[in-house]
């Protein structure tokens, strides 16, 4: 799952960049692309570790199919794919901020939205930019402190190591 996830993500990124270039849209700098590659590998590591752990409990194809459907839908909500994180109730926002896959989404958003946020909020007060980033899940704020990208990287590394160890031990 780890290798396939990386291949599919890189494939999507490359073709997305080709498409954006063909229609005259903004194309990402090489610096951002290299960082995205790192996030892809890190995300695949953490996600495949969690999947390995969950799969270690499933014994039939039907159990796997049911778990995949439920987990896949739940993950969409918990990473802010369906509804912006800031529009969720406070207790759900708290849960999202401690969900490992949401840290992947934060890192992707920070890299992919960096240029457009800077450009679109250039004439806005800092408070508006800060609030927008929180609502859209570009940053996570814990007790009034904005988490750095490195906190998300560490969260994903720890998640990957812990869940791979648990999958092996189960």
Segments predicted by a language model, with ranges:
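Alpha-helical transmembrane segments and their short interhelical loops
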Residues: 2-75, 165
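Short alpha-helix boundary/capping motifs
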Residues: 10, 82-83, 106, 123, ...
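Residue-level signal for alpha-helical transmembrane segments in multi-pass membrane proteins
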Residues: 14-19, 79-82, 109, 162-169
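Short alpha-helical linear motifs
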Residues: 16-23, 89-94, 114-123
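Membrane-interface helix-boundary signature
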Residues: 32, 61-62, 92, 145-152
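Transmembrane helix segments
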Residues: 58-116
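Alpha-helical transmembrane segments of multi-pass membrane transporters/translocases
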Residues: 114-170
């Amino acid at each position: 799952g780890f290798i396939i996830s990386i291949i599919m993500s890189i494939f999507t990124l490359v073709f997305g960049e080709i498409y954006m270039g063909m229609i005259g849209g903004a194309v990402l700098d090489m610096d951002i692309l290299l960082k995205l590659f790192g996030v892809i590998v890190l995300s695949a590591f953490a996600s495949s570790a969690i999947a390995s752990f969950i799969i270690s409990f499933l014994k039939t194809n039907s159990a796997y199919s049911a778990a995949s459907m439920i987990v896949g839908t739940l993950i969409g909500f918990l990473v802010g794919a369906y509804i912006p994180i800031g529009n969720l109730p406070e207790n759900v926002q708290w849960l999202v901020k401690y969900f490992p896959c949401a840290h992947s989404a934060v890192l992707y958003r920070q890299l992919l939205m960096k240029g457009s946020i800077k450009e679109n909020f250039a004439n806005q007060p800092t408070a508006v930019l800060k609030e927008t980033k929180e609502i859209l899940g570009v940053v996570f704020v814990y007790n009034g402190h904005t988490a750095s990208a490195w906190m998300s990287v560490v969260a994903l590394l720890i998640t990957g190591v812990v869940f791979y160890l648990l999958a092996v031990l189960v």
